């Protein structure tokens, strides 16, 4: 009997778990038996591994071969285990085990000729290896820039199975850590490109300062998409931990760029209005993959033509909006992805959507039904609502508005003021602050609260609406350089909440 052993990583969501792979060669009829809850792609690895091993000049054991992946109760999915399976088989045929194999995690898919192909989810796998104290990890050479983002662990890139064998024997080396640029190219979109729309521009600035959700109700062609695309440019760059978290999500989704693997700027995700629930919040067969809400984590999720999106997809947004994460239950377990994003909704005021509102042919009931798809609980979570109007000819002769860099400076100062205020309480932005904290310890003066009390008495606001209005008021105060909101900030925040879409 001969036994070989190698190690790999199973990724579920953004978490990784170490998988031990054992290859046992015993007397009996030749055959390969794979155990440990493998999926279809992993079952097919038997043929890939056998062809790769023999095509690299090695012999395949002419006996009964059992490949066991532990823990046995953990579902194993994908082709990431190929090179670990091959290494375990080759180790079982050696008279002396490879020492490096006991201290190295192996990730990668094999082609039939022994080339190592790139796989998804390398970054969360390497992070899991570092967390569990592994000294080294070998990844496909094409994934090496991504793996090199993790410090404190030895990462190596391999191109062929033969190259891996030579390294395990100690006869040759493998490519080491790659230093890549740590910046994402700045977007060429500038806020100065937007003509007119001063109220909507200011709403975007307030949204950036406090991380608030925003809704734009506007006729077609007025500039709602331009405004939404320029919101990420006003947001601060991601911190080191945020960059790794966002990059890990895009790694699992298979969307990383080989040139700039580290995402340092807030992402902008704009799914089509016909997207399904699974495309929006995540899902799919086998391992649940991140949806648009997770890909927009720490960035902006733009839903254009939101009144055309299915009701089930819209209602699925309520949980990530409230919790900042999405949990996807599948037969084999639950995958959890972070989903803390800024939501920007955009809708036409009616189905016919004429350029001039006077040309509208929709009945009043039709208009109510059109925007009525946006439920009260969903709209209640949107802090800023703006009704945009078509431009007049004079708007094109007016002076250009402020640029993105100018507005970004004010946003940065406002965010810094908010961060210093909320840091002792565990918050960073105004939109994250809990309602009880706002109402008890940071309650504005009695005079400043007058507009809110009036709206609450008239039934125009819910308690959650009061909390969200106070958050916007704090953002307005931060932009104005005030230490607390006054009656003007509270009234302005309330006006942002009471304009826009009407249900």
UniProtKB/Swiss-Prot annotation:
One of its GO terms (molecular function) is ATP binding. It holds the Pfam family Mg_chelatase. It comes from the Bacteria. Signal peptide: none annotated. InterPro entries: AAA+_ATPase (IPR003593), CHLI-like (IPR045006), Mg_chelat-rel (IPR004482), Mg_chelat-rel_C (IPR025158), Mg_chelatse_chII-like_cat_dom (IPR000523), P-loop_NTPase (IPR027417), Ribosomal_Su5_D2-typ_SF (IPR020568), Ribsml_uS5_D2-typ_fold_subgr (IPR014721). Belongs to the Mg-chelatase subunits D/I family. ComM subfamily. This is Uncharacterized protein MT2965. It comes from Mycobacterium tuberculosis (strain CDC 1551 / Oshkosh).
């Amino acid at each position: 009997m001969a036994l070989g052993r190698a190690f790999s990583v199973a990724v579920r969501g953004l978490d990784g778990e170490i998988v031990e792979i054992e290859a046992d060669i015993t007397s009996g009829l030749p055959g390969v038996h794979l155990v440990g809850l493998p999926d279809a792609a992993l079952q097919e690895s038997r043929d890939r591994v056998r062809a790769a091993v023999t095509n690299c000049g090695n012999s395949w054991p002419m006996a009964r071969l059992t490949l066991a992946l532990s823990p046995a109760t953990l579902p194993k999915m994908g082709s990431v285990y190929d090179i670990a399976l091959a290494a375990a088989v080759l180790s079982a045929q050696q008279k002396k085990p490879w020492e490096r194999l006991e201290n190295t995690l192996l990730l990668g898919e094999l082609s039939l000729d022994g080339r190592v192909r790139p796989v998804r989810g390398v970054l969360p796998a390497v992070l899991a290896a570092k967390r569990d104290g592994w000294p080294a990890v070998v990844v496909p050479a094409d994934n090496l820039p991504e793996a090199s983002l993790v410090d404190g662990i030895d990462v190596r890139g391999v191109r062929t199975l033969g190259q891996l064998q030579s390294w395990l024997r100690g006869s040759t080396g493998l490519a080491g850590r790659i230093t890549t640029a740590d910046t994402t190219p700045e977007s060429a979109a500038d806020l100065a490109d937007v003509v007119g729309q001063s109220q909507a521009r200011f709403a975007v600035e307030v949204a950036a300062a406090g991380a608030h959700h925003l809704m734009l109700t506007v006729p077609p062609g007025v500039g709602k998409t331009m405004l939404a695309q320029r919101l990420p440019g006003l947001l601060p760059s991601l911190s080191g931990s945020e960059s790794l978290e966002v990059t890990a999500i895009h790694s699992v989704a298979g969307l990383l760029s080989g040139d700039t693997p580290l995402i340092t700027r807030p992402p902008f995700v704009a799914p089509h209005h016909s997207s399904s629930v699974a495309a929006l919040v995540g899902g799919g067969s086998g391992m649940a993959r991140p949806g648009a809400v997770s890909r927009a984590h720490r960035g902006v999720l733009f839903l254009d033509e939101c009144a055309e999106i299915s009701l089930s997809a819209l209602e699925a947004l309520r949980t990530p909006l409230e919790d900042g994460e999405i949990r996807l239950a599948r037969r084999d377990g639950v995958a959890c992805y972070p989903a803390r994003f800024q939501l920007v909704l955009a809708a036409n005021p009616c189905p016919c959507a004429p350029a001039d509102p006077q040309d509208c042919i929709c009945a009043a009931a039709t208009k109510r039904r059109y925007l009525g798809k946006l439920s009260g609980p969903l709209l209640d979570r949107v802090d800023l609502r703006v009704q945009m109007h078509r431009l007049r000819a004079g708007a094109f002769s007016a002076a250009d508005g402020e640029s993105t860099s100018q507005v970004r400076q004010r946003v940065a100062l406002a965010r810094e003021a908010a961060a210093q205020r909320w840091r002792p309480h565990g918050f960073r932005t105004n939109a994250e602050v809990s309602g009880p904290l706002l109402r008890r310890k940071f309650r504005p003066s009695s005079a400043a609260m007058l507009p809110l009390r009036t709206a609450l008495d008239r039934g125009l606001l819910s308690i959650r609406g009061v909390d969200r209005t106070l958050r916007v008021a704090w953002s307005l105060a931060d932009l104005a350089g005030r230490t607390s909101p006054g009656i003007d900030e509270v009234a302005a925040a309330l006006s942002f909440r009471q304009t826009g879409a009407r249900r």
